[in-house]
């Protein structure tokens, strides 16, 4: 800060197994055969290739809007030659090439017409559907050919309502056999040669008018699900399961409850995480899978969901790291620690791919001893999330274990109560070597839900988990951010507010603040004077240029910057906090979200503490008597940047506070407690690390503790000893006595509670 002491102005049971292709990107110009096959003559016209599995396979890569013809992948055979380039009708091709992606035409469309008709459709082409008289259109009347070779929208269906079940439709690219829709009637679907059917090949009309299974589609080898498609479909299905548990616990499945469910001690969810550690995955993908799972565990926990976890890795044999029966299996932090300690090398000596054995390990955790079911067994919902390429090479067909699990859970045995809601098997295929037939066979088939996905690589899979988790119903939860690499500054600091005060003939002052509710921004009192008018105060949030209208500024009643002038202290910053009340309610979005405040119910949930947690216990958790890692957010070159600091709250606290005497105007203060009251937190200095310092424009911003993937504000930036940002540039070399002082929010809680009493924050 300035040398004249001017003030400173950031669930349910899952089984997750991973088998991937072990991708190594290999630029064409640098390619070297790592296997026994030569790379000579394998180029693709208009594209490139990359080696997989240490040179034992390769993938052809084409620009967006194109696909590799006639195949996407080739394998190195034992004879030392690459697999033949063959078309879908078994014709041999001399050289691979990149061809433009087309969308398939409708083979059949019942009870209506579509236009225009063409043998194929180019990207961006549109088709329209309409029904004959007496039939009603369901689905999308207009559909567009997308760059991934799929049609936008939903299957168009013309139905007259005459059947017991509605017409299940004919997805574009498929053929349907069967046109009777009476109870127990069935229809079957088929794909053209070379395409793979995803979903249910056979569907049966069931009691209640619903169809068994899920809508099929025909997939080409080059087709991948986008991260957005996967996230939306998976989250939609996942929410159905959570809502079902919520309803059984006696709660209505309200919109705000979908991600706030805390399961009772008997537990109605288990999560089994199963990772493949075989040769086919590769060390890099194994690490990426762990990262995805850690993120999933953290985020599920951050919503207040406390399922029990099982953790298994496998190759030739499975290894159980965490059992759902263990006392700590519902402790997300403990499970994450166990996951992080697993190494890819743990299965190095036995590196086959035995998916069946892995699922049997899960079955063993689901089952009960002596064949006597425990009380409440039939209320536990099971979800299996399996990430695999479907290329199991030993142990037999894993689908038999899925059948055994269904039998154990009494699923599909009673026509009137099939209990399908109690088991969901999601299968994620990762990479180009995915066997689409095998992964489709393992996945659940449920009406209007998707359980099988194919993503291009581990990077796309990480995108899925980011997009899947940050859905709109969580926007009101405090201290949550979107940490994705594509996120903007305000995705990563959605609480941050910029404040500007314009004073005629005196210029303007810039400060920061934090969104704490839909109507209030918390900042520093010294950013304003009693003469400032509401219209002269500008507040912006979410990175938007449009300023918010101000209703009033509320100062802490004990704040008085001139309170000790008679004692020779020119500026006194005790109780330096203020609340800006907005005229209009904020609409939360990913770039505008509240930060957590101490001693609120939201912070109790964020810290995963028991509901009975007291304010004192929160304080002990957030501000223990030691050096505390914290952060603040500063603007540098028009970008928001997090600065990591340490709050000196242990043996370094005294020396940190004594350095206040180096501030201009405080050099003659005999008792430093006259200016550094118990309401201040101190950062800065060079021990235990050299802390960055705040600048003038950082005043009023939040001092934050980042814990358990949530951000909790513990202080408000107030003043500093040294102006480290002279001439609008942060100095790299600063003295050891460069300290910053922040108002401790735990010390002003009565005022916060009074002013924010109508904001539904649940102060303790």
From Swiss-Prot:
Cross-referenced Pfam families: Sushi, Trypsin, VWA
Signal sequence interval, chain numbering: 1-25
Keyword Membrane (UniProt): no
Disulphide bridges, residue numbers: 37-76, 62-98, 103-145, 131-158, 165-205, 191-218, 478-596, 511-527, 599-615, 656-682, 695-725
Site (Cleavage): 259-260
Domain Peptidase S1: 477-757
GO cellular component: extracellular exosome
Keyword terms: Cleavage on pair of basic residues, Complement alternate pathway, Disulfide bond, Glycoprotein, Hydrolase, Immunity, Innate immunity, Magnesium, Metal-binding, Protease, Repeat, Secreted, Serine protease, Signal, Sushi, Zymogen
Top-level class of the enzyme under EC nomenclature: hydrolase
Active-site residues, as the UniProt record annotates them: 526, 576, 699
Signal in keyword set: yes
Primary location group: secreted
CDD domains with a match to the protein in the record: CCP, Tryp_SPc, vWA_complement_factors
GO molecular function, one term: serine-type endopeptidase activity
Domain VWFA: 270-469
Record text on subunit structure and interactions: Monomer. Interacts with complement C3b; this interaction is dependent on the presence of Mg(2+).
Entry protein name: Complement factor B
Species per Swiss-Prot/TrEMBL record: Pongo pygmaeus (Bornean orangutan)
Gene: CFB
């Amino acid at each position: 800060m300035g040398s004249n002491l001017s003030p400173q102005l950031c669930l349910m049971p899952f089984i997750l197994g991973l088998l991937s292709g072990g991708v190594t990107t290999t630029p064409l110009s640098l390619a070297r055969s790592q296997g026994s096959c030569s790379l000579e003559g394998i180029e693709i016209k208009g594209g490139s290739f990359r080696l997989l599995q240490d040179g034992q396979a390769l993938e052809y890569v084409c620009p967006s809007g194109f696909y590799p013809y006639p195949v996407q992948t080739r394998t190195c055979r034992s004879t030392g030659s690459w697999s033949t380039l063959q078309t879908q009708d078994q014709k041999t091709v001399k050289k691979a090439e990149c061809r433009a992606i087309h969308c398939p035409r409708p083979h059949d469309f019942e009870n209506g017409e579509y236009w225009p008709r063409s043998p194929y459709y180019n990207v961006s082409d549109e088709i329209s559907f309409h029904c004959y008289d007496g039939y009603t259109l369901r689905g999308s009347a207009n559909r567009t050919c997308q760059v991934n070779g799929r049609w936008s929208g939903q299957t168009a269906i013309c139905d007259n309502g005459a059947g017991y079940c509605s017409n299940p439709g004919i997805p574009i690219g498929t053929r349907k056999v069967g046109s009777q829709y009476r109870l127990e009637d069935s229809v079957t679907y088929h794909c053209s040669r070379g395409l793979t059917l995803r979903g249910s090949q056979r569907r049966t009309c069931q009691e209640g008018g619903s169809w068994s299974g899920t809508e099929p589609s025909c997939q080409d080898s080059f087709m991948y699900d986008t991260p957005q498609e996967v996230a939306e479909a998976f989250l939609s299905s996942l929410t159905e399961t959570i809502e079902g548990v919520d309803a059984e616990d006696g709660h209505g499945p309200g919109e705000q409850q979908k991600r706030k469910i805390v399961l009772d001690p008997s537990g109605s969810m288990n999560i089994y995480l199963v990772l493949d550690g075989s040769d086919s995955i590769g060390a890099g993908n194994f690490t990426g899978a762990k990262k995805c799972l850690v993120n999933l565990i953290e985020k599920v926990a951050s919503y207040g969901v406390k399922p029990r976890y099982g953790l298994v890795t496998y190759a030739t044999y499975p290894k159980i790291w965490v059992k759902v029966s263990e006392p700590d299996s519902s402790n997300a932090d403990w499970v994450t620690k166990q996951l992080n300690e697993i190494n890819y090398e743990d299965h190095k000596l036995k590196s086959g791919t035995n998916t069946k054995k892995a699922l049997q390990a899960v079955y063993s955790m689901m089952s009960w001893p002596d064949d006597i079911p425990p009380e409440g067994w039939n209320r536990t919902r099971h979800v299996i999330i399996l990430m695999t390429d479907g290329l199991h090479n030993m142990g037999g067909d894993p689908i038999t274990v899925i059948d055994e699990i269904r039998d154990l859970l009494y699923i599909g045995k009673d026509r009137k109560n099939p209990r399908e809601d109690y088991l969901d098997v999601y299968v994620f295929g990762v990479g180009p070597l995915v066997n689409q037939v095998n992964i489709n066979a393992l996945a659940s088939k449920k009406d209007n839900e998707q359980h099988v996905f194919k993503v291009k690589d581990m990077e796309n899979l990480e995108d899925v988990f980011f997009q899947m988790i940050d859905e709109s119903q969580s926007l009101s939860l405090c201290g949550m951010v979107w940490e994705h690499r594509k996120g903007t500054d305000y995705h990563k600091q959605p609480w941050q507010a910029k404040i500007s005060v314009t004073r005629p003939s005196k210029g303007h002052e810039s400060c920061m603040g934090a969104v704490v509710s839909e109507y209030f921004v918390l900042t520093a009192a010294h950013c304003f004077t009693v003469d400032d008018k509401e219209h002269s105060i500008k507040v912006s949030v979410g990175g938007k240029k449009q300023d918010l209208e101000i209703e009033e500024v509320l100062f802490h009643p004990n704040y008085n910057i001139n309170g000790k002038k008679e004692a020779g202290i020119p500026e006194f910053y005790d109780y330096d906090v203020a609340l800006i009340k907005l005229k209009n309610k904020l609409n939360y979005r990913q770039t505008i979200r509240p930060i957590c405040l101490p001693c609120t119910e939201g912070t109790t949930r964020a810290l995963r503490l028991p509901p009975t947690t007291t304010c004192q216990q929160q304080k002990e958790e957030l501000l223990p008597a030691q050096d505390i890692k914290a952060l603040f957010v500063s603007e540098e070159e028009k970008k928001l940047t997090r600065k990591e600091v340490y709050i000196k709250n242990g043996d370094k606290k005294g020396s940190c506070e004594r350095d206040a005497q180096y501030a201009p105007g405080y050099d003659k203060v005999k008792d430093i407690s006259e200016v550094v009251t118990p309401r201040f937190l101190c950062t800065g200095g060079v021990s235990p690390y050299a802390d960055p310092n705040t600048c003038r424009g950082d005043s009023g911003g939040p001092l934050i503790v980042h814990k358990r993937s949530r951000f909790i504000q513990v202080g408000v930036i107030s003043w500093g000893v040294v102006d480290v940002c002279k001439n609008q540039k942060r100095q790299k070399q600063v003295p050891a006595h460069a300290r910053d002082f922040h108002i401790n929010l735990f010390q002003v809680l009565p005022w916060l509670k009074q002013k924010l009493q109508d904001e539904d924050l649940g102060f303790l």
